[in-house]
Amino acid sequence: MTSILYLASQSPRRRELLTQLGVTYELLLADAGEDAEALEAVRPGESPDDYVQRVCALKADAALQRRARRGLPDAPILTSDTTVCRGGDILGKPADARDAAAMLASLSGTTHRVLTAVTVATSAGQRHALSISHVTFRPILAPEIERYVASGEPLGKAGAYGIQGRAAEFVERIDGSYSGIMGLPLFETAALLREAGLHF
């Protein structure tokens, strides 16, 4: 049993959720020379489910190499990746405000899926889980989209929204994992961590 975990994520939401579980962790962030964004490139014809799981596993591989380079103790590493999809279209992080507005307009009045993959990597191998949730947005008026985008909240978030923030007013219904939609499904994460021998 171990009580140390490395979290390879810059997301403040994932940190909050991991703390909510009562897990003690240390951050294992990318080095300046690592191109973390390159890991998130979508392959032609790749399904959203395959995409999010592949990216999460690649993040785990990169974090294992980082841990070895830094000579850190052999403790489990947690990575996660979230994507929003409408049909087969992957809606990643918006490039800019205009892109964010277009994404939100495409989600207005529809039901979309939020996929969050989780990987726990140890020297013995990797364990994976996938959380799939359905989120229904009410119709969102153009001025509402404009105000929300102007707040800056959509930037840096898959699908151009954070469910725990101002976008909560757009959410008519959720079917699935609220914490998964935020970026770290706690049920699946806790199970993977315990399987990896983490004590919390």
UniProtKB/Swiss-Prot annotation:
Its main location: cytoplasm. Keywords: Cytoplasm, Hydrolase, Nucleotide metabolism. The record marks 13, 82, 164 as: Important for substrate specificity. The keyword Iron does not apply. It is found in: Cytoplasm. One of its GO terms (cellular component) is cytoplasm. GO terms for molecular function: dTTP diphosphatase activity; UTP diphosphatase activity. Gene3D superfamilies: 3.90.950.10. It catalyses: dTTP + H2O = dTMP + diphosphate + H(+); UTP + H2O = UMP + diphosphate + H(+). Its cofactor is a divalent metal cation. One of its GO terms (biological process) is nucleotide metabolic process. The keyword Chaperone does not apply. Its EC number is 3.6.1.9. The active site is at 81 (proton acceptor). It holds the Pfam family Maf. Transmembrane segments: none annotated. PANTHER family: BIFUNCTIONAL DTTP/UTP PYROPHOSPHATASE/METHYLTRANSFERASE PROTEIN-RELATED, BIFUNCTIONAL DTTP_UTP PYROPHOSPHATASE_METHYLTRANSFERASE PROTEIN-RELATED. Nucleoside triphosphate pyrophosphatase that hydrolyzes dTTP and UTP. May have a dual role in cell division arrest and in preventing the incorporation of modified nucleotides into cellular nucleic acids. Belongs to the Maf family. YhdE subfamily. This is dTTP/UTP pyrophosphatase. It comes from Cupriavidus metallidurans (strain ATCC 43123 / DSM 2839 / NBRC 102507 / CH34) (Ralstonia metallidurans). The lineage of its organism: Bacteria, Pseudomonadati, Pseudomonadota, Betaproteobacteria, Burkholderiales.
